[in-house]
């Protein structure tokens, strides 16, 4: 069964309600996928039971949201077991990680522990996360109040919007969709992302720079960024030498997730084909099937600045920063760029530890 799980998230006035309707139209009119929409849990509670501003503390409300959201997501998984549709897209109007936007890392960890869950485990349940930037960041775009459950003023909305995207920084396929004056442009951006996911291919114009040692990364912690350890296993590929078959094992706080993807670098363009979250069992099966020829161990620090996502990748003795190309992009003052990396294949090859044969 082909299942694509998409979390649609964002702060107040990000346009989720409007874009959800457009997603419904697109999927039903242009694909052969069955579409399942999982409604927003916090809004259900606010409209029918209790508003977040009426509770004694944020933790109690988020605990209730978490419990209901987790039940709904499990319920959808159960339904799919006896669904006769072979191809399904599930769109979650906010996912379970959105709870973190209202709690600090310590409280969120406590919440997860009470349900015996791990953050990375929950993140890997989604194939794609689409973050819709709120118009509250801009003075030239109207900030609306079409959702009756909304209670934030514009300043609070900006803060909540930033906390929302920061909550999802640990996801390997997080897409940031900027707010636009023309709503149709934002809709088109979202549809393009979903279309790429359906077709198992995405091309991104990226830039990579080596970092100077004077860069200060000490300002980042679990409350404003995400640091994940990753090991990339490069597999033998006799089918197409231009593409790299890569298995990735990710780890965070004694939790693990696994990814299989095919990647090609061409100057400033990165092409990714068929990136999927997989089980540990599937990870081992694929490794045995193709054979591992080299590995790279690294740390990936993801942070959000000036409404853009950055990844700092640390190897043994070297650091680089990667981001989607944007002519208006600003790099934070604590980040010092050394030089642009023009040949990513060459740079990555220099970080590899080559082996004759790896038994996993």
Feature annotation, model-predicted:
Residues 106-169, 180-181:
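A glycine- and Lys/Arg-enriched "phosphate-lid" helix/loop adjacent to the NTP-binding pocket
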Residues 2, 156, 160-206:
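NTP-dependent small-molecule kinase module
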Residues 198-360:
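Phosphate-end processing signature that detects enzymes handling 5′-triphosphorylated RNA
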Residues 19:
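Hydrophobic positions on the alpha1 helix immediately C-terminal to the Walker A/P-loop
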Residues 24-68:
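Conserved substrate/cofactor phosphate-moiety recognition/catalytic segment
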Residues 50-110:
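Conserved nucleotide-sensing/catalytic segment adjacent to the nucleotide-binding pocket
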Residues 16:
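Conserved lysine of the Walker
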Residues 11:
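P-loop (Walker A) phosphate-binding loop of NTP-binding proteins
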């Amino acid at each position: 069964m082909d299942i694509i799980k998409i979390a649609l998230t964002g702060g107040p006035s990000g346009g989720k309600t409007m874009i959800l309707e457009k997603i419904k139209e697109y999927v039903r009119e242009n694909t052969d996928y069955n579409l399942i929409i999982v409604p927003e849990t916090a809004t259900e509670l606010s409209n029918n039971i209790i508003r977040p501003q009426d509770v004694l503390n944020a933790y109690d409300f988020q605990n209730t949201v978490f419990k209901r959201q987790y039940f709904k997501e499990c319920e959808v998984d159960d339904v799919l077991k006896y669904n006769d549709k072979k191809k399904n897209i599930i769109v979650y109007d906010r996912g379970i990680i959105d709870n973190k936007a209202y709690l600090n890392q310590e409280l969120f960890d406590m919440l997860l522990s009470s349900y015996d869950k791990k953050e990375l485990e929950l993140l890997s349940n989604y194939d794609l996360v689409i973050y819709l930037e709120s118009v509250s960041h801009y003075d030239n775009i109207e900030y609306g109040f079409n959702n009756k459950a909304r209670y934030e003023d514009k300043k609070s909305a900006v803060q909540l919007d930033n906390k929302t995207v920061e909550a999802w920084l640990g996801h390997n396929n997080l897409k940031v969709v900027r707010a636009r004056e023309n709503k149709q442009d934002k809709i088109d951006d979202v549809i393009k992302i979903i279309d790429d996911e359906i077709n198992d291919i995405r091309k991104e114009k990226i830039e990579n720079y080596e970092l100077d040692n004077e860069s200060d990364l000490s300002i980042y912690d679990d409350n404003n960024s995400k640091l994940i350890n990753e090991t990339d296993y490069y597999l033998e590929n006799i089918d197409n030498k231009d593409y790299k078959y890569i298995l990735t094992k990710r780890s965070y706080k004694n939790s693990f997730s696994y990814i299989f993807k095919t990647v090609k670098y061409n100057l400033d363009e990165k092409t990714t084909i068929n990136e999927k979250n997989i089980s540990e069992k599937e990870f081992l099966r694929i490794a045995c099937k193709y054979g591992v020829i080299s590995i790279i161990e690294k740390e990936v620090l993801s942070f959000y600045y000036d409404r853009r996502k950055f990844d700092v990748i640390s190897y043994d003795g070297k650091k680089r920063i990667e981001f989607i190309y944007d002519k208006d992009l600003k790099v934070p003052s604590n980040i010092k760029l050394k030089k642009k990396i023009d040949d990513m294949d060459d740079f990555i090859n220099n970080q590899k530890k080559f082996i004759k044969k790896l038994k996993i």
